[in-house]
Amino acid sequence: MRAQGRGRLPRRLLLLLALWVQAARPMGYFELQLSALRNVNGELLSGACCDGDGRTTRAGGCGHDECDTYVRVCLKEYQAKVTPTGPCSYGHGATPVLGGNSFYLPPAGAAGDRARARARAGGDQDPGLVVIPFQFAWPRSFTLIVEAWDWDNDTTPNEELLIERVSHAGMINPEDRWKSLHFSGHVAHLELQIRVRCDENYYSATCNKFCRPRNDFFGHYTCDQYGNKACMDGWMGKECKEAVCKQGCNLLHGGCTVPGECRCSYGWQGRFCDECVPYPGCVHGSCVEPWQCNCETNWGGLLCDKDLNYCGSHHPCTNGGTCINAEPDQYRCTCPDGYSGRNCEKAEHACTSNPCANGGSCHEVPSGFECHCPSGWSGPTCALDIDECASNPCAAGGTCVDQVDGFECICPEQWVGATCQLDANECEGKPCLNAFSCKNLIGGYYCDCIPGWKGINCHINVNDCRGQCQHGGTCKDLVNGYQCVCPRGFGGRHCELERDECASSPCHSGGLCEDLADGFHCHCPQGFSGPLCEVDVDLCEPSPCRNGARCYNLEGDYYCACPDDFGGKNCSVPREPCPGGACRVIDGCGSDAGPGMPGTAASGVCGPHGRCVSQPGGNFSCICDSGFTGTYCHENIDDCLGQPCRNGGTCIDEVDAFRCFCPSGWEGELCDTNPNDCLPDPCHSRGRCYDLVNDFYCACDDGWKGKTCHSREFQCDAYTCSNGGTCYDSGDTFRCACPPGWKGSTCAVAKNSSCLPNPCVNGGTCVGSGASFSCICRDGWEGRTCTHNTNDCNPLPCYNGGICVDGVNWFRCECAPGFAGPDCRINIDECQSSPCAYGATCVDEINGYRCSCPPGRAGPRCQEVIGFGRSCWSRGTPFPHGSSWVEDCNSCRCLDGRRDCSKVWCGWKPCLLAGQPEALSAQCPLGQRCLEKAPGQCLRPPCEAWGECGAEEPPSTPCLPRSGHLDNNCARLTLHFNRDHVPQGTTVGAICSGIRSLPATRAVARDRLLVLLCDRASSGASAVEVAVSFSPARDLPDSSLIQGAAHAIVAAITQRGNSSLLLAVTEVKVETVVTGGSSTGLLVPVLCGAFSVLWLACVVLCVWWTRKRRKERERSRLPREESANNQWAPLNPIRNPIERPGGHKDVLYQCKNFTPPPRRADEALPGPAGHAAVREDEEDEDLGRGEEDSLEAEKFLSHKFTKDPGRSPGRPAHWASGPKVDNRAVRSINEARYAGKE
């Protein structure tokens, strides 16, 4: 391990070194290429000769020992007045010894680069090149000091060895081209070239824009020639990390990681993630929020899978049978005479009427009858004669007429030809009557009938009377409907209700019917009157609607159809785009935040130099920082408008400031200072020096001649005139003829002609330096001559398909329809203007809206009145047609003024005993009060604070808990609880109320009153017994109804639901009666005896096998950890069903939804482990008891469901200590015990 750690250390050091090298990479380079140096006299700046031989030029010139010349370069910040002292803040460099007094090097450019490449290939270094790297934003302005020195084997600078010092303060932009500089000093003439280049992946005029192309998690972009990130297709954002989602994708419920997709959040779906996911398994329902299941019409149940109108959806009854909806997914057929079966599919005595003609014989079959025809006849009743028309030669439904040796086709109107094979356009004759349109078909035509009509020509009124009316009611056919005229004493849509005075709901408009001895009395709601509340008080007389709106009188209310310019209940409020100022204002300075972001996100509309201020109506204005102006604060105020720089200086505009770049010969902040070129004295005491602009003049003494009084013979030499000027000797003086672009006595002053005409466009400023120039571009422009407009639309700032319009240092988003905001991130809420009529709900959509209409209204804006269903009243509260509500433990719904409620006896409601008197009375229904519960009703203490609402007795029934009574109208449920999971303070009454409130309990109590009574079970302290019965109990031929109710309640309990009480249930036992006929005879006893013999044989075989295996293990004497242990657990067996007339049977089921209850670690486990250590005599005794139990079986049907919330399926069992034995002969302790055992 230590060696491995020592191996890791070098790797870590190498990694840190690599990271340091990467971080230390420069942003750019300043390069200087020396081309030539000419020191004609071989002298130093002090006038002495090189190599310190003591001679001076004043004494007559230097000897043949030339200077050993090398160059030092110092780069520092821009100085209006250059000072040679001080640090080289930008960097410094030096060359080796390059030559003697004068030398030439390959110039910069293509030819020079090739020469230097050949030198490097030969192993030589480029001697005249000085490269100074920098790791900061290049400021473009700089000061360059170049010094030529004489090498004298001394590493310390010595001013006495200085040959020449020249300086240049100017501006240069990064580019590949070289910029030439010429210097004529006091002693030497220097020619050099400079340039600035950005390092790889660095761009802009300051080399501080870093851009490295990438296509990974951190970005998806390339780099253009200006270093701008160009997002790849489908990506956007500052770093091109945000994928462009599908247009219209709801960013509140979805997003994307791949361009063009729209990935929905959990619970949402659809193309734009704007559709919620319904509850799993929801069949005929929809949702508004995720995991809902709102049922469609005629569907019910938790998953909307219960067909409430099975007859109307499936039409199961055949042969004219009448279908009646019994309960969800159930129906009953009332068959006509001569038919029977569940669907009236069986015909009875079909051959009695001799249906077979021409001597055919009739045979009855389950579906009716069949005719066996004699030779020469065919058909269902042997009525068809076989002839030439038997092959159906006539097409298109033509009628074949048999003739002698032939046939004739009588074609329908739609067809013509010998065999009716040619089609005719039947729609020309307009055959369709009550139809939307006529469509010509091949071989006929089709009439698109209006609802309520049928037939080929839509001329037959659909007979909607199909036996729906019961109890002798007369059905009256209507167009697309029917009406039942009921006989006296019956009512309802199908005359299915037995009428009393109030059963037919005689009171209209939601009136409450009061049954009286001699009739009834209607208590009308507000807005109605009359004996039957049939008189609707016309609230439209006089009309309350304003501004010309039409008034509609509704049920107890009115509705005003407002014009487009007004709204409100009475159309008295002018409609505004933002009524009451409650509309959401589109903030021009912000955008909607995306998921996980704060409320608003800055849009950046004012750029980096302004602050956005919102204005009314979604507008904005920008408050600019000092030095900026413009609508978007995108324009830098030009501080050079007053031309503050003097003497031809170039003014460079900066942020709220300016800078002057002076021409040669001038310095200072405003270029108003002429530096003294006579310092140090260039005349070397041979004459008097006069200062000029970027030059000097020596008035020589004692016969000395030349520019610096250095010659006795000539005024001119090769270096008298600078920059290529031609020298003319005039005897006592000289004259220089300057080339274009230069002026002055020695051609040392540049005319700045490189900026004439101005090469910089779009407001750029040209800074000349001899024959070269540099452009300083205004914000928003870039390039060598400021020709490229900076792309402010990159990276893409516009969302949802918005188009970005690039300006000069600004951008604008043109949004797609339905979107707004500076970056098109706001989905325009078309509901802000309240386009929907009063009372309707507006739902915003992309580039539109949708109106959700209240009942009785329709139209695009819910402005059309189509009528209302009647409301229902419950306890003084009105409920509109189609609505649902809960009363106590029952669920109710309103069906056109009729209350349809489940019939569950809600029993005694739990209540708190302690508290204020008014609070105690409010817990119980009217007329009841909170009383102390009966003793022994607490399932898990403390329960002293809980009581029960009294004064309501249950219906009289013999089906009581702990009574042992079972019949066709009585079932008994025994619920076993895990007391550790039962909440404290739980009483038997609370459990009973929870079961009564189950949706499944309400569903089985539609036709009869369902009574549930609870008490502590005698089988254990953690068990509750529930007695289930219907009231009244008459007309129950068998126990199927009570069995169905019991099993539905048990199924709901096993699903647990959201009740903490039901989660604590570990086992449910169901007991119902099973009736049998006397026709069984001796079959049951014989079967019981045979089963008993087989069971005893199995027991004997198991005992023998167990002993044999035990002996084998004792002989083998294997170690304990190597012995096999069979972990197979026996299933709960079905006990011997003993069936006899009027008796009962006891059957045991294992509930797969439940798991066995948890047990203590020291408690013996059921199954093999729990019986491993049982002695052999104890096993025999248990077997004997099992036989006795089977003979003492009672007559109750018992279904047992068990579960264990405390053990997970994957947890290993804890086996008890002792020798390991075969487990297959051991009975599970979960085997059923017969109820009622003595």
Swiss-Prot record:
Annotated SMART domains: DSL, EGF, EGF_CA, VWC, VWC_out
TM stretches of this protein: 1081-1101
Subcellular location: Membrane
GO MF, one annotated term: Notch binding
Cytoplasmic side: 1102-1238
Bilayer topology term: Single-pass type I membrane protein
Domain DSL: 196-240
Tissue specificity field: Expressed in heart, placenta and skeletal muscle and to a lesser extent in pancreas. Very low expression in brain, lung, liver and kidney.
InterPro entries reported for this sequence: DSL, EGF-like_Ca-bd_dom, EGF-like_CS, EGF-like_dom, EGF-type_Asp/Asn_hydroxyl_site, EGF_Ca-bd_CS, Growth_fac_rcpt_cys_sf, JAG1_1/2_dom
Highest rank taxon of the organism: Eukaryota
Pfam families reported for this sequence: DSL, EGF, EGF_CA, EGF_DL_JAG, hEGF, JAG1, MNNL
Disulfide bond sites: C198-C207, C211-C223, C231-C240, C245-C256, C249-C262, C264-C273, C276-C287, C282-C293, C295-C304, C311-C323, C317-C333, C335-C344, C351-C362, C356-C371, C373-C382, C389-C400, C394-C409, C411-C420, C427-C438, C432-C447, C449-C458, C465-C475, C469-C484, C486-C495, C502-C513, C507-C522, C524-C533, C540-C551, C545-C560, C562-C571, C589-C612, C606-C622, C624-C633, C640-C651, C645-C660, C662-C671, C678-C689, C683-C698, C700-C709, C716-C727, C721-C736, C738-C747, C755-C766, C760-C775, C777-C786, C793-C804, C798-C813, C815-C824, C831-C842, C836-C851, C853-C862
Effect of P682S: In LGMDR27; uncertain significance
Annotated stretches, region: Disordered: 1114-1139, 1156-1238
Major localisation: membrane
Effect noted on mutating R712C: In LGMDR27; uncertain significance
Basic and acidic residues: compositionally biased ranges: 1114-1123, 1183-1206
Glycan attachment positions: N153, N570, N619, N752, N1058
Keywords: Calcium, Developmental protein, Disease variant, Disulfide bond, EGF-like domain, Glycoprotein, Limb-girdle muscular dystrophy, Membrane, Notch signaling pathway, Phosphoprotein, Repeat, Signal, Transmembrane, Transmembrane helix
Alphabetical list of PANTHER family matching this protein: CYTOCHROME C OXIDASE POLYPEPTIDE VIC-2 (PTHR12916), DELTA-LIKE PROTEIN (PTHR12916:SF12)
Record's protein name: Protein jagged-2
Taxon lineage: Eukaryota, Metazoa, Chordata, Craniata, Vertebrata
The gene coding this protein: JAG2
